[in-house]
């Protein structure tokens, strides 16, 4: 069946033509974790996102396959790096950490939640993957989602998002889950100050 997302819908930032925003209004983290580390299993993915003038920017991502203790230490290091940026005003505050509340994510929420500098929000997905993808589509189509230019991991991200199919015949969708969670949090549920003033 047909692909849901079109790679051409994404906007890009980080070059002379498309400069980096002057600051982030706030930042947040999404995480989608896999239970098993076998070749055919999904990856665990953690993303850092920024919001500026009602648009969503992917800032950084770590993707891999880790057993529970290693997953916790990897995620803790990623979250600490994001949290430490708070010291610079233009980098905005880390406002939220969203972790899928399923399988290994539940364990991560419990163990990381105890040490987290920011409240951890467990994501309990009420809708199926396709519905969440369809909900996210109009926001990407409208040019509200920006990806960083010139970073190695973005190629794999765009490739996976482009390969996502309506009939679930695609191989992996862990990065798609992070994308739809981020859009749901920042663009669907969160009406920014910008939207209230200018729309």
Give the predicted meaning of each segment:
Residues 31-44:
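An active-site-proximal beta-strand-loop segment
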Residues 1-2, 12-15, 183-199:
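Acidic two-metal-ion nuclease catalytic site recognized across multiple nuclease folds
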Residues 45-47, 52-168:
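Mg2+-dependent endonuclease catalytic cores in nucleic-acid-processing enzymes, primarily RNase H-like
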Residues 29-30, 48, 98, 177:
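Structured core elements
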Residues 160-185:
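Charged alpha-helix within mobile-element recombinases
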Residues 1-34:
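ATPase catalytic-site recognition across NTP-hydrolyzing enzymes
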Residues 33, 101-102, 174-175:
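Generic detector of well-ordered alpha-helical packing
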Residues 24-26, 54-57, 175:
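Conserved catalytic motifs of the protein kinase core domain
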């Amino acid at each position: 069946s047909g692909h849901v997302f079109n790679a051409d819908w994404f906007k890009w930032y980080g070059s002379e033509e498309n400069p980096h925003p002057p600051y982030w209004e706030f930042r947040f983290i999404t995480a989608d974790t896999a239970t098993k580390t076998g070749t055919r299993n999904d990856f665990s993915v953690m993303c850092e996102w920024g919001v500026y003038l009602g648009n969503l920017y992917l800032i950084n991502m770590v993707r891999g396959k880790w057993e529970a203790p290693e997953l916790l230490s990897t995620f803790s290091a990623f979250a600490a790096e994001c949290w430490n940026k708070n010291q610079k005003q233009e980098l905005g505050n880390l406002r939220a950490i969203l972790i899928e509340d399923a399988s290994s994510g539940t364990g991560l929420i419990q163990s990381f939640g105890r040490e987290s500098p920011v409240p951890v929000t467990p994501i309990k997905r009420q809708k199926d993957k396709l519905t969440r993808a369809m909900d996210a589509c109009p926001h990407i189509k409208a040019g509200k989602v920006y990806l960083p230019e010139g970073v190695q991991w973005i190629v794999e991200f765009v490739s996976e998002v482009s390969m996502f199919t309506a009939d679930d015949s695609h191989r992996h969708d862990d990065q798609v889950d992070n994308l739809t969670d981020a859009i749901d949090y920042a663009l669907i549920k969160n009406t920014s100050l910008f939207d209230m003033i200018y729309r």
